[in-house]
Swiss-Prot record:
The organism's place on the tree of life at top rank: Eukaryota
Domain Peptidase M66: 140-402
Gene Ontology biological process terms, A to Z: proteolysis
Protein name, entry field: Dictomallein-1
Cellular component terms (Gene Ontology): extracellular region
Signal peptide coordinates: 1-19
Binding site for Zn(2+): 294, 298, 304
Cofactor(s) named in the record: Zn(2+)
Enzyme class: hydrolase
Organism of provenance: Dictyostelium discoideum
Compartment(s) where it occurs, according to its Swiss-Prot or TrEMBL record: Secreted
EC number: 3.4.24.-
Gene Ontology terms, MF aspect: metal ion binding; metalloendopeptidase activity
InterPro entries: Dictomallein, Peptidase_M66_dom
Length: 592
């Protein structure tokens, strides 16, 4: 009887303890995820700003969490869409990864564990537990998935070749080590950097258009003939943009970079001494180091951080990283401090030229503000600020992605369902910006890429066709001005694509003659009119040798199922009315 009473008392005690445990929650604080930067679980926002830097999906990430009792063992369970992905045991604070260059530890109080990339998805939730307690559920603010394709297309100019400069094996691709480090610096899910199908551009001359610094057009044969340090680079950017457009890559997550390899008047390699970037294209030297990552930043739409700070559009003083979150490199398994490492060249006398934090330590500059060279030993690149990663993260958010596994061949991110969904291309704004979202009508076929320049004021050597390229590429839709049935669709204001010629007219036609005697006509969505005046007056700039309007550049692809024998560019004013051989003016003609 006494034994029974004692047993009942013991069971009652255990029940009370269990009830107390069941009614309490494991307390967790300061939950962070580290991939490109170390971010709070809700992401990072800025005062008086509507943007948020979100945690990256499909990227292995370091989870950090702080608990009241650091001596206990903790686990974390991860769900995605309420499906359990798995359970992991966190490492205690002593096992937190180190800081670059043996710098100050990021934390001495955080448990941590790497979360597999397949678990890092929107609609993710996590729960921590010990043997007796469980935490509430936490919901990381996961962003959209961006998989970047980067085309590398070297320009060998003025006699530069593999022997007197650098071979294509160096200029036309980046190593896996470089690619692996780049992805650690960019808020992307993946990076695919490849040599462009064209492979390389080899030209003995370059046409500089009129208008830059109020100068006339010029044909040059060495880099010393440029009239300012960025003139050649500016032309290269225009060509890259044209090739990107000719392949229908404008709506997609595609960047271009052109290593610029050219010879000077002495016949020797001439360093470009800088770079230029913007609008998803960039150019610079061939080394794929500081200039490359800086110009890639411009390609994403990032300005110089110092100028942006002065205009109130960058939160950290003078383009520095003072206030930015630390970075983290999964490949090196170490934190990246915002302070300049003490064992690199930039550290010496840095207090004379760099921003100092409250402890008088020198603070790194952003990659977009002279930050090249601030990286620790063993790294190729320094850091972007967390604030700049928002621009990188959002740059391709509205991209239309080609994916054969979707019924239409395209997908687009849905910000409501937080996943990619089937997208059906359509023509917006009555065709003002092209047909079917500016996407190709054929992909990955043999094409010729044709690049034409013309000057309306001369000299004659500015009007020419560069050597054509044959490669794999995409084809864009064109209307045939000799086909009245097709022209019905682009009559201004009254047709299916009523604004197709409203940007600045449709005043030029390409004629391709093939070796078999057949011909092809293509009306260009380009003209000599002002905005929204497809039949309006022609501007005066076309006869001004110092105006950019007096120079014309046309870049397009044609299918390489037949061999062209002649390519011609005609001025066909009001081309939406048709091609009239008696009134058409031949601008450029070249036989092959």
């Amino acid at each position: 009887m006494k034994i029974l009473i004692i047993l009942l008392v013991f069971l009652n005690l255990i029940t009370n303890i269990n009830c107390a445990v069941c009614s309490s929650r494991l307390q967790v604080s300061d939950i962070k995820f580290a991939n490109t930067h170390v971010l709070p679980i809700e992401g990072k926002s800025w005062k008086n700003n509507t943007v948020t830097l979100k945690i990256l999906p499909n990227r292995e990430s370091l989870l950090l969490a702080k608990f009241q009792d650091q001596t206990l063992s903790y686990t974390v369970k991860v769900w995605v869409d309420d499906s359990l992905m798995g359970k992991l045991t966190l490492n205690d604070p002593s096992k937190l990864p180190p800081t670059e260059s043996n710098g100050t530890k990021y934390s001495t109080v955080h448990h941590s564990i790497r979360i597999p990339k397949d678990w890092m998805k929107p609609k993710m939730k996590i729960q921590f537990s010990t043997m007796l307690l469980k935490s509430e559920f936490f919901f990381p603010n996961i962003g959209h998935e961006t998989n970047l394709n980067m085309w590398l297309l070297p320009f060998y100019l003025f006699g530069a070749n593999d022997t007197n400069t650098q071979p294509l094996s160096v200029t036309g691709s980046i190593s896996k080590d470089v690619s692996d480090e780049l992805i650690q610096k960019w808020s992307l899910s993946s990076l695919n950097a490849l040599n462009h199908p064209i492979s390389r551009i080899d030209w003995s001359y370059l046409i500089l258009p009129a208008g830059r610094n109020n100068l006339p057009g010029l044909r040059i044969t060495n880099s010393d003939q440029k009239r300012d340090g960025y003139e050649i680079m500016s032309v290269v950017l225009g060509i890259l943009s044209g090739i990107r457009g000719a392949n229908g890559e404008g709506p997609s997550s595609v960047l271009y970079y052109a290593p610029l390899i050219h010879l000077g008047a002495n016949g020797k390699y001439a360093d470009p001494w800088g770079g230029l970037g913007g609008g998803s294209v960039g150019t610079g030297d061939y080394s794929y180091t500081g200039i490359f990552i800086h110009e890639a930043g411009h390609s994403y739409g990032l300005p110089h951080a110092g100028d942006s700070y002065k205009s109130g559009n960058y939160p950290y003083v003078d383009g520095s990283l003072l206030g930015s979150e630390w970075g983290f490199d999964m490949n090196h398994n170490e934190f990246l401090s915002v302070n300049i490492p003490s064992n690199i060249g930039a550290y010496k006398n840095c207090n004379k030229s760099f921003i100092l934090d409250q402890n008088k330590n020198c603070v790194k500059q952003s990659v977009m503000q002279g930050g090249a060279g601030n990286q620790a030993q063993g790294y190729r690149y320094s850091m972007f600020a967390d604030y700049e990663e928002v621009t990188i993260q959002n740059y391709f958010k509205d991209s239309i992605i080609y994916d054969k596994s979707f019924s239409t061949g395209y997908k687009k991110w849905n910000t409501t369902t937080l996943k990619y969904e089937t997208y059906t291309p359509s023509t917006k704004s009555n065709g003002l910006y092209g047909i079917n979202d500016g996407l190709p009508i054929e992909r990955n076929v043999d094409v010729y890429t044709i690049i034409i320049t013309h000057s309306f004021v001369g000299p004659a050597n500015l009007s020419q066709i560069y050597p054509i390229f044959k490669s794999k590429g995409n084809l864009m839709p064109f209307f045939d001005p000799t086909n009245s049935t097709q022209l019905v669709d682009i009559r201004p204001n009254v047709s299916k694509y009523a604004w197709y010629c409203h940007a600045n007219g449709c005043d030029y036609t390409i004629k391709i003659t093939y070796t078999d005697g057949t011909t092809k006509y293509m009306l260009l969505q380009r003209g000599k009119r002002s905005w929204f005046s497809p039949s309006g007056a022609i501007g005066s700039g076309f006869t001004d040798p110092l105006s950019g309007e007096s120079s014309l550049s046309v870049i397009f692809n044609i299918k390489a199922d037949k061999t062209p024998s002649k390519i011609e560019l005609f001025e066909t004013l009001l081309g939406f009315n048709g091609f009239n051989s008696t009134t058409a003016t031949l601008l450029v003609s070249q036989s092959f």
